[in-house]
């Protein structure tokens, strides 16, 4: 009898409205209300890594003889639906809409304040 192989999950890239360098505010979870800069986006997983948010402690074993192990704190990823773009001028978080300019270029705009991001 043949052995069943697990099905491969299709990796579908999700178009994200949050980009590296944006300032975002966490809207749910233990870090609710915290703001930080997006360090990295993970579009396949629909997640972002935000500076100073969702800190995890990791114990690292020594790699060479004579080296001691250490404890490292680093930011873990947060789902993109749990953050909103944050306006530093108005100090408010808002959803994002895509606006097509007359020349055909796309810009991101905050819905609450009307502030253009790109």
From Swiss-Prot:
Keywords: Ribonucleoprotein, Ribosomal protein, RNA-binding, rRNA-binding. Pfam families: KOW (PF00467), ribosomal_L24 (PF17136). It comes from the Bacteria. GO terms for cellular component: ribonucleoprotein complex; ribosome. GO terms for molecular function: rRNA binding; structural constituent of ribosome. GO terms for biological process: translation. Signal peptide: none annotated. InterPro entries: KOW, Rib_uL2_dom2, Ribosomal_uL24, Ribosomal_uL24_CS, Ribosomal_uL24_KOW, Translation_prot_SH3-like_sf. Belongs to the universal ribosomal protein uL24 family. Part of the 50S ribosomal subunit. One of two assembly initiator proteins, it binds directly to the 5'-end of the 23S rRNA, where it nucleates assembly of the 50S subunit. One of the proteins that surrounds the polypeptide exit tunnel on the outside of the subunit. This is Large ribosomal subunit protein uL24. The gene is rplX.
């Amino acid at each position: 009898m043949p052995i069943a192989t697990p099905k491969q999950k299709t990796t579908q890239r999700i178009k994200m409205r949050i980009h590296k360098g944006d300032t975002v505010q966490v809207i749910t979870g233990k870090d609710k209300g915290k703001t930080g800069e997006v360090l990295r986006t993970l579009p396949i997983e629909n997640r972002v890594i935000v500076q100073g948010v969702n800190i995890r402690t990791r114990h690292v074993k020594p790699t060479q003889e004579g080296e001691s192990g250490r404890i490292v704190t680093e930011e873990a990823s947060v789902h993109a639906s749990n953050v909103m773009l944050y306006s530093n001028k108005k100090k408010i978080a808002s959803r994002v809409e895509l606006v097509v300019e007359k020349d055909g270029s796309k810009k991101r705009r905050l819905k609450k304040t009307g502030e253009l991001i790109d």
